Swiss-Prot record:
Superkingdom of the organism of origin: Bacteria
Species for this entry: Chlorobium chlorochromatii (strain CaD3)
Lineage, uppermost ranks: Bacteria, Pseudomonadati, Chlorobiota, Chlorobiia, Chlorobiales
The protein's role, per its UniProt record: The glycine cleavage system catalyzes the degradation of glycine. The P protein binds the alpha-amino group of glycine through its pyridoxal phosphate cofactor; CO(2) is released and the remaining methylamine moiety is then transferred to the lipoamide cofactor of the H protein.
CDD domains for this protein: GDC-P
Catalytic reaction annotation: N(6)-[(R)-lipoyl]-L-lysyl-[glycine-cleavage complex H protein] + glycine + H(+) = N(6)-[(R)-S(8)-aminomethyldihydrolipoyl]-L-lysyl-[glycine-cleavage complex H protein] + CO2
PANTHER family from the UniProt entry: GLYCINE CLEAVAGE SYSTEM P-PROTEIN (PTHR42806), GLYCINE DEHYDROGENASE (DECARBOXYLATING) (PTHR42806:SF1)
Pfam families for the chain: GDC-P
Keyword tags: Oxidoreductase
Protein's recorded name: Probable glycine dehydrogenase (decarboxylating) subunit 1
Family: Belongs to the GcvP family. N-terminal subunit subfamily.
Subunit and interaction comment: The glycine cleavage system is composed of four proteins: P, T, L and H. In this organism, the P 'protein' is a heterodimer of two subunits.
Enzyme Commission code(s) on record: 1.4.4.2
């Protein structure tokens, strides 16, 4: 489609309609120092073959996990995605569907979401799941706001190491809604200091939040954290890696009131950070406070099963000040990916993926710890991710390993800490793990 610019007279008419005399007056609130003071350096117009060649050259400069052995984690993991997933979600009835407002003509989409919700409830050991949130970080932030709404309290305690990006999103949500800042519990050996946590949690705390496994990969003492939370009448919020639940206990089994998670490991590609999937589940007593969409099963007038959007308490449906949340969309396609992934793998398949990831991670951790100059930063148990102290800056190590066609891990210096965060999935072979260790041992300081 060609771009047809507005004329000078049309621009003048639009400016007059909104009550300003010039474009500069329209953008007066934008500091002059941050405005571009030169003409845009645009390419000349290109035909389709030229555009294709240009984009292919640009794309060729990327380094991806199809060509490099990846040990990157920190929230996005290189798990295998069965080809059947793309085939199913690419069907036009799924791929083009948006909000199923008209239930009578959206039964297929609604049933797919209902099946996703059912799978999340089984996986997390909870009673109700919504149709999804934007991502794991926004799901956690919404969970905390929900806890504050339920309890009438204004503080949140973070037990253990929460992903820094999630912490940033949570702070943004709380500051924008006028709530108090986050209280961070102390850490011991990479996870929550239980004694310190007990002293922190009181009758002013709305929620205690824990990530399982935490950002460092360490497994938190979730049962003890849950007990401390409930002693003070607070809401226990768990952000659990869904794939880890193939081998770890479900949040519902150790008392989580709200359990959320980042659904990327369930069939979504890493995709340079998104789009991802926010999982949100609750216990039955909190169902009327749940944010986002919720699909329910009902009977039509002929007695046949049907699916509808139910308990719609978002700002689109009721007064904004009475709404449980102002979220106005969900990640239905990514939720479908997760449902297809779990359906294809089944219970045993998920257990095998989780077990292989854990076993290979521990094999690699032991091998790296035996190298001169390398050591594990924490002794706490972990799932498929761990932190290594290195004999050189992690950034330098990562740079050298890229030359060996390996992504060595995530540099914690990004967050002002020492160490290299390494993740291992079921995709890594023993040959790749051994080659990684050999490459590390040959590095130059």
């Amino acid at each position: 489609m060609p771009f047809i610019a507005t004329t000078e007279s049309e621009r003048t008419e639009m400016l007059q309609a909104i009550g300003v005399n010039s474009f500069d007056e329209l953008i007066a609130d934008i500091p002059y120092s941050v405005r571009l003071q030169r003409a845009l350096e645009l390419l000349p117009s290109l035909d389709e073959p030229q555009v294709r060649r240009l984009l292919e050259r640009m794309a060729a400069s990327n380094r991806c996990t199809a060509e490099y052995v990846s040990f990157l984690g920190g929230g996005a993991y290189d798990h295998f995605i069965p080809s059947a997933i793309k085939t199913i979600i690419s069907r036009s009835e799924f791929y083009t569907a948006y909000t199923p407002y008209q239930a009578e003509v959206s039964q297929g989409t609604l049933q797919a979401i209902y099946e996703y919700q059912s799978l999340m409830c089984r996986l997390y050991g909870m009673d109700v799941a919504n149709a999804s949130m934007y991502d794991g970080a926004t799901a956690l932030a919404e969970a905390v706001l929900m806890a504050m709404n339920v309890t009438g309290r204004d503080q949140v305690v973070v037990a253990g190491k929460l992903h820094p990006h999630t912490t940033a999103v949570l702070k943004t949500y709380l500051e924008a809604s006028g709530h108090q800042a986050i209280i961070q519990n102390a850490l011991v050996d990479g996870r929550s200091d239980i004694a310190a946590l007990k002293a922190l949690v009181n009758q002013q705390v709305a929620a205690v939040v824990v990530q399982q496994p935490n950002f460092y990969g360490c497994l938190e003492e979730v049962e003890a954290i849950g007990a401390i939370t409930h002693e003070q009448g607070a809401i226990f919020v768990v952000s659990a890696d869904p794939l880890s639940l193939g081998v770890l206990a479900a949040p519902g089994s150790y008392g989580a009131d709200i359990a959320v998670g980042e659904g990327q490991p369930l069939g979504s590609s890493q995709s340079f950070g998104g789009p991802y999937l926010g999982i949100f589940t609750v216990k039955q007593q909190l169902v009327r406070k749940i944010p986002g969409r919720l699909v329910g099963m009902t009977k039509d007038r002929d007695g046949e099963d049907g699916f509808i959007l139910t308990l719609q308490t978002r700002e689109q449906h009721i007064r904004r000040e009475k709404a449980t949340s102002n979220i106005c969309s969900n990640q239905a396609l990514n939720a479908l990916q997760a449902a297809v992934y779990l359906s294809l793998l089944g219970k045993q398949g998920l257990q095998q993926v989780a077990a292989q990831s854990a076993q290979k991670a521990h094999y690699l951790a032991n091998a790296i710890a035996a190298l001169p100059g390398f050591s594990l930063k924490f002794t706490a148990p972990f799932f498929r991710e761990f932190v290594v102290e290195t004999p050189m800056p992690a950034a330098h190590l990562i740079e050298q390993m890229v030359e060996q066609r390996m992504f060595a891990g995530y540099d914690l210096a990004t967050h002002g800490e020492s160490g290299l965060l390494i993740a291992v999935t079921e995709q890594r072979t023993k040959e790749e793990l051994d080659a990684f260790v050999a490459a590390l041992s040959a590095l130059k300081a």
